[in-house]
């Protein structure tokens, strides 16, 4: 299962969850049956019932632990499920080229989804840039010239007139 951005359409979350459960159960069933094949019809039916119960138990355990298993999906099963499309998940026969981004799991904003995130403007970021000297929080009244933030000499006005006069 490979994550990507697709513009083909969206499914409800319940539909996608049931598809993923079906894929996981089918893969677990396929692997267990191929290992436990004894030959008789009764043995296969018993194995199917046992495997469904095991798949549910494994799924419940994994949900509690927050673990998402990596599964190999049969190509035929993928061809049958082509009608399912999602903007977040792409079912593919190929393995992903890179591992999932783990840095998202470490980000505190991802872990705490109830907190509000500060918006930022597009473009150049000034993160980590601080002024060299501390600012002063007092009025200066005896200055007639100063240096602005670009390093240019400027005249300080003693009085500012506003409105018509």
Swiss-Prot record:
Cleavable signal peptide: 1-3
Residues cleaved off as propeptide: 4-119
Residues carrying sugar: 112
Recorded GO CC terms: axon; dendrite; extracellular space; synaptic vesicle
SMART domains: NGF
Keyword terms, alphabetized: Cleavage on pair of basic residues, Glycoprotein, Growth factor, Secreted, Signal
Subcellular location: Secreted
One GO BP annotation of this record: neuron projection morphogenesis
A Pfam family assignment: NGF
Main location: secreted
InterPro entries, alphabetized: Cystine-knot_cytokine, Nerve_growth_factor-like, Nerve_growth_factor-rel, Neurotrophin-3, NTF3_N
Function summary: Seems to promote the survival of visceral and proprioceptive sensory neurons.
Family stated for the protein in its record: Belongs to the NGF-beta family.
Name the UniProt record assigns to this protein: Neurotrophin-3
Gene: NTF3
